C-alpha cells in the first residue's frame, strides 16, 4: 500500500506540512522502482564474527546505506568530506547511517503471490471482484484445484473449479491447448486482469434495480460498493496479487548482538528469511524441471511464507519462533495497544520529565507546587547552561555541566532565576479527565518528594499514601504561554462535567471550618451571665485572643481578668451598622469571606462551602475566589489543629431502642416464616419480606443513632457527629455499622443473605458474623480490580467516537430545538428545571405565565443562573432549548447549540474540543464509581417504599387509572400506566380537575405514578391532608386482580402440561403454579356471571411462574386476588450493574430479555396462542388497523385486554430496545430516551453530569442514515452514509433535475460509529486496523486530516484550541505585521486546548 500527501493547490505552513493523505494499493512498478533501493537475494543477515552486514542479505549496506555515519563498508572513504560518493570497491554510498531507517528493498518472487489482506479479510475483496466464495479462492490460491480462465473450445464455464482428476479428464477429452486453467496466484492474477470492472458495475446496478428481495439487494449493494471503489480510484484489481515483496528498512527490524555470541532480533527478520529461503529454493527447482507435485508444494509454501509475513496466523497455524511463541508479523506491528498506532504515534515518551512521590504542601499558594531542587536542576539543565554561558561564568557546555554536577553556588542562583515564571505541568496517572494535567509555578524545596497544594488533590484524585506524580517542562515560548494562560491550577477550579467547584476544602480543612462555624454551644445566660455585645469585629477578636482561646476543653471558664470568650459562645456584634447575633468563630471565619458575599451566619458543612465558592466566583471573579480558597485552606487547617478533635470509643453511642427494635423485627420475621409454613406465601415472598423487615430496621436504627449523636450537650459536640455532618469523613451508613448494626450483607453474586449482622463494630462481631461479612467485603475488592479496566475501555471508546466534535462556528442558525422539563420521581423532584437549563440557549421567547409583558428570556439568550431561577420560580414546566442534538453545523457543532463552558461559566470558545470533554465527563465518574463500591464493604443497599404519603393538602385525582373497589373498600389499580395527582382545592368538580390536568391547564402539587396492584386508600376526588397515607405498594408480588363478580373457570390450566402442583417442603400444603410449556395452551382464568358457566364476563391471562390463588368454580368478588407473580429476589444495585448498562446504551445493544413496545396507538386485545407465544393485538379504534405482537408465555404482560396504549408504550416487563424506539417513535424520542437512561445510571450513584455531554455522544451515534431508495444519486441501496454526505448528494442531484435518495436514520453503537468515521487513520488506530486499511486502500480513500487523532498521528498540530484554524490564521498575520503582539493575543484568547 502507499500513502501520499497531496501538495497541489495547498498553502503550506512554514513547516511544509501536507493537508491530506491518500492511501491506495501499490503496483509492482511502485514497489520496484519508487520504493526499493535494491533486490535482496540472500537470507543472510550479519557476519557472526565481524558483525558486519552480509552483502546482498537482509542488512546489506549497498542497498540500505552505511552502518556508520560518513563511512563506507570497506573503509576506503571516511569522514564527511566524501559525502555522496559511491565507493567503487564495496558499492556503498557515503552518507548518514539514519538512511537505514528510510531505505527499502524488495524480494523478486519466483511466482505470483496473493496478498492475504485482500483475500482473507472479511469481506474478501478478491472474492467480491471475481464473484467467488472465499473457500473456492482458498482452494485455488493454495494449489488444491485449478480454475478455468478461458474455456476455449470446451464445455467448461469460466471460473469453474477442477480437481486433478477432472483436469486430466478434460485434457484427455479436449486436448491441452483447447482451454486455459491455472492454479495459485497466477490464476487469480489472470482472472482479475481479465475482469472488466466498468461493465460489471453496470450489470450489478441493473440487477440491483430489478431485484426485489431485501437480502439479495443488500448482498449486491455490498459487492457494488467494492467494485465502485476500484472503478473510481486509480487502483487496478490485479495489484492485489504481488510480483515482488517490499522489505522494511533494516533499522526498523533491528538485529542486536548480545553477550555470549547470541543475537536479539525482530521477528520480521525470521519471517523475511523464510520468504527468501523458499523463494530461492523455488527458483532452483524451477530451473531443474522438477516434478509438478514438488513444484506445486513449494509454491504453496512460498504463498504461506508471504502470508505469515503480512499477517501471521490469519491462514492456518501461526509460524512459531523460539519458545513456541507466534512470530509478530507486519499486521501485529500495527494492531492493538503495543502496535505502531497506539504505542508510537498516539502516545510518545516525553523528555524533560521527572517523577516522584507526592507529599502535602499546605504552605503553598494555589498556583504553586514544590519541586525538589535536584529534580529541578536536572529538568532545567539546558536553560541553566545557556544562562551560565550568557553571564560569562563558563564558555563550554562541558564545563557548565561539570559546574552543575559540583553544585556551585551560582548554579542555584541561576536556577532560582530561571524557574520564576516558567510553569511546569504536573500529571497523575490515570489521567481520566483534563484536570489530570495542570500547570503550576515551581517553588524549589529540599528533599526528594514533590509538594502539592491540598486543594488540587480532588482534581487529580490524589492522596498522600504513596501516590506518584510526573512533572513535565514546557519548552517553547508557545507551550509555556498556553500552560500559563490555560492550564494553571487557578484556572481549573470547576469541573467541566458539571460546573461544580472541584477545588473545595475536604477532610481536615472542612472539619476545621465546620468546627469554627458550628452553632453556639455556650450560652452565657445559662452561666448566670449576659450575652456580650461588641461594637465591631476587632473587639471580638481582641476578646477572643487576649483572654485566652477558650473552647470545649476549657469548660467555659474565664481567665482572671474575665475577658475570655468561648469560640462557640453566643454573642452580639455590630457589623456594617447592624447588630448580629452570632459566635466568635463565625466572626473569625467572615474575615476571609469577600465583602460582596455578606456575613455568613450559619454552619458550614462541605456542601455549603462548595455553594459559597460558586457564589464567590459568580460575584467577585476568579482572582478573588482563588485568594478565598487559599484563605479557606489556611483557616481550615489552623482551626482543625486548635480544635484537636479526636474520636473515642465512648463517642460511638448505641441507640437505647436497639434491643426493642430487634425483638420486634425477630417477631415479624417469625410471623412471615409462619405464613410460609402455612402455605400462604411462597419461599421467594418469604425471602423478600424478611429482607424488607431488616432493611426497615436498619434505616430506623441508623436514624435513631444519628439523632442520638447529634444531640448536643451544653458545651460539647460529639466528634463523630462533627466529622460526618461536616462531610469531612464517613457517612451515615458507616456510622450505622459503628454504633447500630451492620445490617444485611450481600453474597458475591449480589443476592442478599437473609440473616443480618445485628452486632455493630463497637460491640464486636461474632465469628460467624465476621465470616458472613467478609463475603461482601471481598466482592468489593475483586469488583474494583475488574471494573476499572472496563471503565477505562468505555472511556476510550467514548473518546474515539467524539474526538472530532469541535466548536467550529459561533451560530449555525438552526430553528430546531429539544424540549426540557424537570426530572421527577413520583412527587420528588430529582433535578429541578433551573439546573437543567442553566447555560443552555433558549429557542423561543419565554414570558412570565399569564403576563406577556414580562420577558424572562429572549430567543437566542444563553440562560444565566439568575434567569434560570426566575424561570423556575415562575412555575414554567417545560422549555424549548437548542442542543448539540439538533445543531446544523456542517462539521462539529456551534457555540450557541452547545451553550456555556461549564469550566468557566463563559460561552464556549471556537476550537474547543467539546467531544473529548464530553467523553471524559462520562468516562471519569465510571472509573471513580467502580473504585468506590468497596467502601461500604458489601452492605446490601435495597430500595423499598411500601407506602405513599402526601406532603400537602389538596384534592386527590386519578388520571389514566382503571380501578376496582376491593372487599375492604379501598381502590385497587388494574393497569400499569397511570398516576394519582394532588391538586390545589379550588372548589371545582372532579371532571373539571381531570380535564384541566389532561390539557396541562393547571399544575398538580404532587404526582405519584402508580402501577398494577397498588392499593389506593383515598377515593377519586376526595380531600387529603399533608402527612396522610394515600396508597400502599405491594413490593413482593405482581398481583392479578379480578374486576368483575362471578364464578371461576380454569382455561388451559392443565395439570402436568401448563401447571404443576408443588407441595411446599416445609408445610406440605399444595400450590398450583403455572409453568413454562411448549403446547398450544393459553393458561387463563375465565370469570362467568352464573354458576352454570354460560355467560363469560372476563378472562385473565396467567403468566408462567404465577401462583393461582383461587379454586375452580369458586365465587369471586371485584378486588379479589386471582393469582400472584412473585417478583425476583432483590439484588443490590451498585454501579456494577450501572457500568454495563451505560455500555449497553452507548453501544446500542439489544438488552437481554427486552420488552415489547406498542407500534401504534390503540386498544389491547388477545388472540390466543401460537407456538408457545401469546398473540397480542393492538387495534387502532379509528382506522381499524391492527399490529400483532408474539409474546413468549414466560414474559410478564403489564397491559390487559381493553387497555389504551400509546405508540412506544411498553407491553411487557424488561428494558426497551433503542432501535425499536427509533423505528416506532422517531429520532427525537430516541435521543430523549438515551440521554435520560444514561443520566439515570449516574444519578443513582449521586454523580452529576450535565446533559450536554451525553447529548454529544448520542449525536455521534445518530450521524448516519441508511439508503432505502437511491433515486438518481450515486448512493447505493442499504448503504450507510453520513447525514452531511446524504444531504449534499441529494442537493447536487436535485440541482441536476434528478430524483433525490430516500433514507432512514440509523442508530450505531459507539464502537461501530468510531470505525465508520470519515478518517481512515483515526479508525485504523482504534480497532480492526487491517480491515480498515484494506477497505481504505481498495477505494483510494483520502484523509483530509480534520480530526484530532489523525493530526496527532501525522505529527501535525491538532485543529483545536490554539491550533484551531481561525486562531492560527490570526497568529500568522500578526507574525507578519507585529511579531511582539502574538503573545498578547494568545493570552486574551478564550479558547482552551
Curated annotation (Swiss-Prot):
Recorded GO CC terms: DNA-directed RNA polymerase complex
Enzyme Commission no: 2.7.7.6
Residues noted as binding Zn(2+) 2 in the record, renumbered to the chain: 812, 887, 894, 897
Residues reported to bind Mg(2+): 463, 465, 467
Cofactor(s) named in the record: Mg(2+); Zn(2+)
GO terms, molecular function: DNA binding; DNA-directed RNA polymerase activity; magnesium ion binding; zinc ion binding
Coiled coil: none
Nucleotidyltransferase among keywords: yes
Gene3D superfamilies hit by this protein: 1.10.132.30, 1.10.150.390, 1.10.1790.20, 1.10.40.90, 2.40.40.20, 2.40.50.100, RNA polymerase II, clamp domain, RNA polymerase Rpb1, domain 3
Similarity remark: Belongs to the RNA polymerase beta' chain family.
Its job: DNA-dependent RNA polymerase catalyzes the transcription of DNA into RNA using the four ribonucleoside triphosphates as substrates.
Protein name according to UniProt: DNA-directed RNA polymerase subunit beta'
Amino acid at each position: 500500500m502507499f500513502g501520499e500527501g497531496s501538495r497541489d493547490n495547498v498553502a503550506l505552513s512554514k513547516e511544509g506540512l501536507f493537508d491530506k493523505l491518500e492511501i491506495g494499493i501499490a503496483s509492482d512498478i511502485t514497489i520496484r522502482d519508487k520504493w526499493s533501493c535494491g533486490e535482496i537475494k540472500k537470507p543472510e543477515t550479519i557476519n557472526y564474527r565481524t558483525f558486519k552486514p552480509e552483502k546482498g542479505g537482509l542488512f546489506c549496506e549497498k542497498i540500505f546505506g552505511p552502518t556508520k555515519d560518513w563511512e563506507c563498508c570497506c573503509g576506503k572513504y571516511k569522514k564527511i568530506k566524501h559525502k555522496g560518493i559511491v565507493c567503487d570497491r564495496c558499492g556503498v554510498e557515503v552518507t548518514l547511517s539514519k538512511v537505514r531507517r528510510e531505505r527499502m528493498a524488495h524480494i523478486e518472487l519466483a511466482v505470483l503471490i496473493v496478498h492475504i489482506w485482500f483475500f482473507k479479510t472479511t469481506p474478501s475483496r478478491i472474492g467480491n471482484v471475481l464473484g467467488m466464495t472465499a473457500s473456492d479462492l482458498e482452494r485455488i490460491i493454495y494449489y488444491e484445484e485449478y480454475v478455468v480462465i478461458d474455456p476455449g473450445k470446451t464445455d467448461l464455464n469460466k471460473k469453474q473449479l477442477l480437481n486433478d482428476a477432472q483436469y486430466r479428464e478434460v485434457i484427455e477429452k479436449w486436448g491441452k491447448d483447447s482451454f486455459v486453467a491455472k492454479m495459485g496466484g497466477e490464476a487469480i492474477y489472470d482472472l482479475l486482469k481479465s475482469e472488466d470492472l466498468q461493465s460489471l458495475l453496470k450489470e450489478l446496478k441493473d440487477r440491483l434495480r430489478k431485484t426485489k428481495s431485501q437480502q439479495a439487494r443488500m448482498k449486491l449493494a455490498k459487492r457494488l460498493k467494492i467494485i465502485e471503489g476500484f472503478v473510481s480510484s486509480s487502483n487496478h484489481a490485479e495489484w492485489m496479487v504481488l510480483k515482488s515483496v517490499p522489505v522494511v528498512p533494516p533499522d526498523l527490524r533491528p538485529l542486536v548482538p548480545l553477550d555470549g555470541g547470541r543475537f536479539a532480533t525482530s521477528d520480521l527478520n525470521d519471517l523475511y528469511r523464510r520468504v527468501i529461503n523458499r523463494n530461492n529454493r523455488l527458483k532452483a527447482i524451477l530451473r531443474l524441471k522438477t516434478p509438478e507435485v514438488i513444484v506445486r508444494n513449494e509454491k504453496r509454501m512460498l504463498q504461506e511464507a508471504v502470508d505469515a509475513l503480512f499477517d501471521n496466523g490469519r491462514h492456518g497455524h501461526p509460524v512459531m519462533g523460539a519458545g513456541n511463541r507466534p512470530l509478530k508479523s507486519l499486521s501485529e506491528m500495527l494492531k492493538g495497544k503495543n502496535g505502531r498506532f497506539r504505542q508510537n504515534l498516539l502516545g510518545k515518551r516525553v523528555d524533560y520529565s521527572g517523577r516522584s512521590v507526592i507529599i502535602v504542601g499546605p504552605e503553598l499558594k494555589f498556583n504553586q507546587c514544590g519541586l525538589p531542587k535536584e529534580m529541578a536542576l536536572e529538568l532545567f539543565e539546558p536553560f541553566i547552561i545557556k544562562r551560565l554561558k550568557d553571564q560569562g561564568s563558563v564558555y563550554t557546555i562541558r564545563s557548565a555541566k561539570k559546574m552543575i554536577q559540583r553544585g556551585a553556588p551560582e548554579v542555584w542562583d541561576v536556577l532560582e532565576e530561571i524557574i520564576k515564571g516558567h510553569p511546569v505541568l504536573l500529571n497523575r496517572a490515570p489521567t481520566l479527565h483534563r484536570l489530570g494535567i495542570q500547570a503550576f509555578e515551581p517553588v524549589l524545596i529540599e528533599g526528594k518528594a514533590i509538594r502539592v497544594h491540598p486543594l488540587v488533590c480532588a482534581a487529580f484524585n490524589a492522596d498522600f499514601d504513596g501516590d506518584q506524580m510526573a512533572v513535565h517542562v514546557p519548552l517553547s515560548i508557545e507551550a509555556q504561554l498556553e500552560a500559563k494562560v490555560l492550564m494553571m491550577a487557578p484556572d481549573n477550579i470547576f469541573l467541566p462535567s458539571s460546573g461544580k467547584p472541584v477545588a473545595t476544602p475536604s477532610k481536615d480543612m472542612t472539619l476545621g471550618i465546620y468546627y469554627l462555624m458550628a452553632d453556639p454551644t455556650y450560652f452565657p445566660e445559662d452561666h448566670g451571665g449576659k450575652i456580650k455585645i461588641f461594637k465591631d469585629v476587632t473587639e471580638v477578636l481582641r476578646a477572643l485572643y487576649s483572654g485566652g482561646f477558650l473552647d470545649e476543653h476549657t469548660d467555659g471558664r474565664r481567665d482572671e481578668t474575665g475577658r475570655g470568650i468561648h469560640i462557640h459562645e453566643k454573642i452580639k456584634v455590630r457589623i456594617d451598622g447592624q447588630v448580629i447575633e452570632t459566635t466568635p468563630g463565625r466572626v473569625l471565619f467572615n474575615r476571609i469571606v469577600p465583602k460582596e458575599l455578606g456575613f455568613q451566619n450559619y454552619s458550614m458543612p462541605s456542601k455549603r462551602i462548595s455553594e459559597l465558592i460558586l457564589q464567590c466566583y459568580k460575584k467577585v471573579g476568579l482572582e478573588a475566589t482563588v485568594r478565598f480558597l487559599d484563605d479557606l485552606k489556611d483557616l481550615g487547617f489552623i482551626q482543625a489543629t486548635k480544635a484537636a478533635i479526636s474520636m473515642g470509643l465512648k463517642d460511638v453511642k448505641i441507640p437505647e431502642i436497639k434491643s426493642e427494635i430487634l425483638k420486634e423485627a425477630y417477631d415479624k420475621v417469625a410471623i412471615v416464616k409462619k405464613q410460609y409454613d402455612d402455605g400462604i406465601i411462597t419461599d421467594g415472598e418469604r425471602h423478600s419480606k424478611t429482607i424488607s423487615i431488616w432493611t426497615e430496621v436498619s434505616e430506623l436504627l441508623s436514624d435513631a443513632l444519628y439523632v442520638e449523636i447529634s444531640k448536643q450537650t451544653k458545651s460539647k459536640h460529639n466528634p463523630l457527629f462533627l466529622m460526618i455532618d461536616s462531610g469531612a469523613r464517613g457517612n451515615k451508613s458507616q456510622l450505622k455499622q459503628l454504633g447500630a448494626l451492620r445490617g444485611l450483607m450481600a453474597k458475591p453474586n449480589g443476592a442478599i443473605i437473609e440473616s443480618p449482622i445485628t452486632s455493630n463494630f463497637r460491640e464486636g462481631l461474632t465469628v460467624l458474623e465476621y465470616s458472613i461479612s467478609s463475603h461482601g467485603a471481598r466482592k468489593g475488592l475483586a469488583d474494583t480490580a475488574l471494573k476499572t479496566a472496563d471503565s477505562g475501555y468505555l472511556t476510550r471508546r467514548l473518546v474515539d467516537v467524539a474526538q472530532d466534535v469541535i466548536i467550529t462556528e459561533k451560530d449555525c442558525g438552526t430553528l430546531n430545538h429539544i424540549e426540557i422539563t424537570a426530572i421527577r420521581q413520583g412527587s420528588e423532584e430529582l433535578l429541578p428545571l433551573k439546573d437543567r437549563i442553566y447555560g443552555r440557549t433558549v429557542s423561543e421567547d419565554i414570558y412570565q405565565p399569564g403576563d406577556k409583558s414580562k420577558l424572562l428570556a429572549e430567543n437566542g439568550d444563553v440562560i444565566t443562573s439568575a434567569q434560570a431561577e426566575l424561570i423556575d420560580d415562575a412555575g414554567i414546566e417545560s422549555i424549548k432549548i437548542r442542543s448539540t442534538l439538533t445543531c446544523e453545523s456542517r462539521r462539529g457543532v456551534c457555540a450557541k447549540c452547545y451553550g456555556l463552558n461549564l469550566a468557566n461559566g463563559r460561552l464556549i470558545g471556537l476550537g474547543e474540543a467539546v467531544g473529548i470533554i464530553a467523553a471524559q465527563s462520562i468516562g471519569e465518574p465510571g472509573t471513580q464509581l467502580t473504585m468506590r463500591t468497596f467502601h461500604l464493604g458489601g452492605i446490601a443497599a435495597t430500595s423499598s417504599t411500601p407506602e405513599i404519603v402526601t406532603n400537602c393538602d389538596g384534592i386527590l385525582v386519578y388520571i389514566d387509572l382503571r380501578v376496582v373497589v376491593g372487599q375492604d373498600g379501598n381502590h385497587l389499580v388494574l393497569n400499569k400506566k397511570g398516576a394519582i395527582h394532588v391538586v390545589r382545592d379550588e372548589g371545582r368538580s372532579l371532571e373539571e380537575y381531570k380535564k384541566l390536568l389532561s390539557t396541562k391547564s393547571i399544575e398538580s402539587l404532587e404526582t405519584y405514578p402508580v402501577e398494577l396492584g397498588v392499593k389506593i386508600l383515598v377515593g377519586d376526588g376526595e380531600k387529603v391532608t399533608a402527612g396522610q397515607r394515600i396508597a400502599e405498594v405491594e413490593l413482593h408480588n405482581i398481583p392479578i386482580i379480578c374486576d368483575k363478580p362471578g364464578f371461576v373457570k380454569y382455561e388451559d390450566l392443565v395439570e402436568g402440561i401448563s401447571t404443576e402442583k408443588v407441595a411446599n417442603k416445609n408445610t406440605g400444603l399444595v400450590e398450583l403454579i403455572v409453568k413454562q410449556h411448549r403446547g398450544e395452551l393459553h393458561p387463563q382464568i375465565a370469570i362467568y356471571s352464573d354458576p352454570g358457566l354460560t355467560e363469560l364476563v372476563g378472562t385473565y391471562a396467567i403468566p408462567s411462574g404465577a401462583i393461582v390463588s383461587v379454586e375452580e368454580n369458586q365465587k369471586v368478588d371485584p378486588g379479589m386476588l386471582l393469582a400472584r407473580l412473585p417478583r425476583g429476589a432483590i439484588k443490590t444495585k451498585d454501579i456494577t450493574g450501572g457500568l454495563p448498562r451505560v455500555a449497553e446504551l452507548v453501544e446500542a445493544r439489544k438488552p437481554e430479555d427486552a420488552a415489547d413496545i406498542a407500534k401504534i396507538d390503540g386498544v389491547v386485545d388477545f388472540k390466543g396462542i401460537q407456538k408457545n407465544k401469546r398473540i397480542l393485538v393492538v387495534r387502532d379504534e379509528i382506522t381499524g388497523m391492527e399490529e400483532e405482537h408474539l409474546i413468549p408465555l414466560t414474559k410478564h404482560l403489564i397491559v390487559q385486554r381493553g387497555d389504551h396504549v400509546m405508540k412506544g408504550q411498553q407491553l411487557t416487563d424488561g428494558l426497551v430496545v433503542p432501535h425499536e424506539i427509533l423505528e416506532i417513535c422517531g429520532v427525537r424520542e430516541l435521543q430523549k430516551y438515551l440521554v435520560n437512561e444514561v443520566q439515570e445510571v449516574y444519578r443513582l450513584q449521586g454523580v452529576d453530569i450535565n446533559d450536554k455531554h451525553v447529548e454529544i455522544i448520542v449525536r455521534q451515534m445518530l450521524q448516519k442514515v441508511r439508503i432505502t431508495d437511491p433515486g438518481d444519486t450515486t448512493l447505493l441501496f442499504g448503504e450507510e452514509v453520513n447525514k452531511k454526505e446524504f444531504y449534499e448528494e441529494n442537493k447536487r442531484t436535485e440541482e441536476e433535475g434528478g430524483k433525490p435518495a430516500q433514507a432512514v436514520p440509523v442508530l450505531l453503537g459507539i464502537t461501530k460509529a468510531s470505525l465508520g468515521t470519515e478518517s481512515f487513520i483515526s479508525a485504523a488506530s482504534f480497532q480492526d486496523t487491517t480491515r480498515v486499511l484494506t477497505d481504505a486502500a481498495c477505494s483510494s480513500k483520502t484523509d483530509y486530516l480534520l480530526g484530532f487523532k489523525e493530526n496527532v498521528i501525522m505529527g501535525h498540530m491538532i485543529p483545536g484550541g490554539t491550533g484551531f484554524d481561525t486562531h492560527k490564521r490570526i497568529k500568522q498575520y500578526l507574525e507578519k505585521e507585529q511579531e511582539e503582539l502574538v503573545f498578547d493575543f494568545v493570552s486574551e484568547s478564550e479558547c482552551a486546548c
